[in-house]
């Protein structure tokens, strides 16, 4: 697969529509499937990486870049672009695939994932990868960077919005909640965070390691508007993001229930695929 996989503006950003028709949903599903294929390709070629969480978040990445965010792949550093921070940075393979599909770089770069000197590293690198707005990897830190971007927009009277995706295991980190307090205190209504709730982390289930529920009430108590969705349902993703635009004076948390390893039958809901690359037979 080469440049023919690049789909730059096939789905236009439209904040005024009244829902997607079946053809739009089908196109998003096709793009998300290609993103999952890219994540598998990249981790296979690298012989390392994190396919499970990459697959669970692929639908969210796809919707954001092809339907929600105002970005320009030909000008990745455009000052007025919407920003995206992948706080769970280890799940970048499917994000890289979405960026390739959007036209930030060639699809073949995925075959060099994690190679020394390659454009695409094991965690997002804002200096080396077009389309990456923040270098991440140490869990819990991305939301702080997203808060800074959102506050900068407010101070500069800019209209861009900031989006971030966190893992559910990641919200066990204390820094997440410090940043959440900051976001609410500063009334960052231009900030939307997704929590990818696939229920698994490297050491087992999230409930076993350090239960985080009731997560909705926790974010609400910190001053967030909260929406709960199926993270694989594009209609629900769209509805939550449309509602998020109507929220004033507070940040938004979208709690997205997902399946770790989504789309690959033997990977789904299996903690072992958190950080294991597939082999040729698989």
State the predicted function of each range.
Residues 8-14, 18-21, 70-80:
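Nucleotide/pyrophosphate-binding catalytic subdomain
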Residues 32-48, 196-198:
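N-terminal capping segment at the start of a domain
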Residues 39-42, 54-178, 184-185:
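Cofactor-binding active-site loop characterized by glycine-rich and histidine/acidic residues
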Residues 90-91, 95, 198-199, 233, ...:
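Glycine-rich beta-alpha junction loops
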Residues 131, 135-138, 143-246:
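Thiamine diphosphate
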Residues 19-35:
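N-terminal hydrophobic or amphipathic helices/low-complexity stretches enriched
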Residues 234-282:
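Glycine/aspartate-rich loop-and-adjacent alpha/beta segment that forms the canonical ThDP
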């Amino acid at each position: 697969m080469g440049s023919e996989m690049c789909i730059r503006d096939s789905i236009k950003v439209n904040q005024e529509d009244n829902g997607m028709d079946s053809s739009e949903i089908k196109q998003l599903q096709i793009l998300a499937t290609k993103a999952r294929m890219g994540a598998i390709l990249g981790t296979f070629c690298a012989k390392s990486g994190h396919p499970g969480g990459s697959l669970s978040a692929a639908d969210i990445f796809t919707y954001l870049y092809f339907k929600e965010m105002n970005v320009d792949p030909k000008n990745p550093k455009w000052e007025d672009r919407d920003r995206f921070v992948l706080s769970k940075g280890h799940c970048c393979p499917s994000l890289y695939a979405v960026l390739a599909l959007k036209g930030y770089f060639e699809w073949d770069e995925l075959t060099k994932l994690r190679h020394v000197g390659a454009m695409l590293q094991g965690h997002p690198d804002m200096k080396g990868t077009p389309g990456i707005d923040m270098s991440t990897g140490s869990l819990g830190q991305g939301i702080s960077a997203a808060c800074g971007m959102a506050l900068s927009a407010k101070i500069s009277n800019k209209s861009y919005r900031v989006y971030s995706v966190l893992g559910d295991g990641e919200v066990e980190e204390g820094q997440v909640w410090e940043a959440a307090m900051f976001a609410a205190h500063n009334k960052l209504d231009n900030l939307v965070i997704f929590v990818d709730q696939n229920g698994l982390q490297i050491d087992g289930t999230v409930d076993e390691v350090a239960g985080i529920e009731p997560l909705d009430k926790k974010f609400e108590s910190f001053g967030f508007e909260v929406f709960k969705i199926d993270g694989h349902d594009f209609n629900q993703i769209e509805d939550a993001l449309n509602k998020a635009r109507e929220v004033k004076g507070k940040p938004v948390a979208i709690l997205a229930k997902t399946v770790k390893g989504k789309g690959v039958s033997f990977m789904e809901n299996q903690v072992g695929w958190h950080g294991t690359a597939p082999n040729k037979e698989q």
